From Swiss-Prot:
Disulfide bonds: none annotated. Pfam families: B12-binding, B12-binding_2. The keyword Translocase does not apply. Pathway: One-carbon metabolism; methanogenesis from dimethylamine. CDD domains: corrinoid_protein_B12-BD. Residues 1-91 form the B12-binding N-terminal domain. Methylcob(III)alamin binds at residue 105. Residues 92-214 form the B12-binding domain. This is Dimethylamine corrinoid protein 2. SMART domains: B12-binding_2 (SM01018).
Length: 214
């Protein structure tokens, strides 16, 4: 019988291999001894984070990243089916998540969306290169409690501030929390623009969202 550490490694490696079959096989094995949230967080998401690092270093290319993301989604779907009915139906909150206009990076934000969803939040992922007004319009449409704004470049960081300003103009700021993230974002930046929180990675995003919304 494989140890938990070995199973976690196998899950992570299966994501990096970009092979859906390998991911599903690893998930089936891990399910026997691990909770779904742990499989996603410590295994699949860790692998996806590694894929992101390899992509940034030019060791993997976009098609690999897309295949790895598809494989992860397939693994998460299997686990969602196994989660207790209550976990699937009881929504902790409604979150709109996207990457700001001018920024085509998607990996980190997608991992955050997947992790938030698996933690029990209703997540509306509006993609990448999203115009400022779309964040606010979507939040209104789905009656969101929180907006997650990712920016991966210093040039697009300003978009996070603009979303907050627009929320204020629309009179929504008091009821919609704002979480910012992405490589150039910091806690100091979040404080400066008046965001409710900053999350360095997907696990932290889940913890902060629970802190703010529960």
């Amino acid at each position: 019988m494989a140890t938990k550490e070995e199973l976690i490694q196998e899950l992570s490696d299966s994501i990096i291999s970009c092979k859906k079959d390998a991911v599903l096989a690893a998930v089936e094995k891990a399910k026997q001894v691990m909770e779904p949230a742990e499989i996603i967080e410590n295994g699949l998401a860790a692998g996806m984070n590694q894929v992101g690092v390899l992509f940034e270093r030019g060791k993997l290319f976009l098609p690999h990243v897309m295949m790895a993301a598809d494989a992860m989604t397939a693994g998460v779907k299997v686990l969602e089916a196994d989660m207790p009915a209550g976990a699937a139906t009881k929504k902790l909150g409604v979150i709109v998540n996207g990457t700001v206009e001018g920024d085509v990076h998607d990996i980190g934000k997608s991992i955050v969306s997947t992790m938030l969803q698996s933690a029990g939040f209703e997540v509306h992922d509006i993609g990448r290169d999203v115009p400022i007004k779309n964040f606010v319009e979507k939040a209104k449409e789905v009656n969101a409690n929180m907006i997650g704004i990712s920016a991966l470049m210093t040039t697009t960081l300003q978009g996070q501030r603009e979303v907050i300003e627009l929320l204020k103009e629309e009179g929504l700021r008091s009821r919609v929390k704002v979480m910012v993230g992405g490589a150039p974002a910091t806690q100091a930046w979040a404080d400066k623009i008046g965001a409710d929180c900053y999350a360095e990675n997907a696990s932290e995003a889940v913890a902060k969202a629970k802190e703010l919304l529960l």
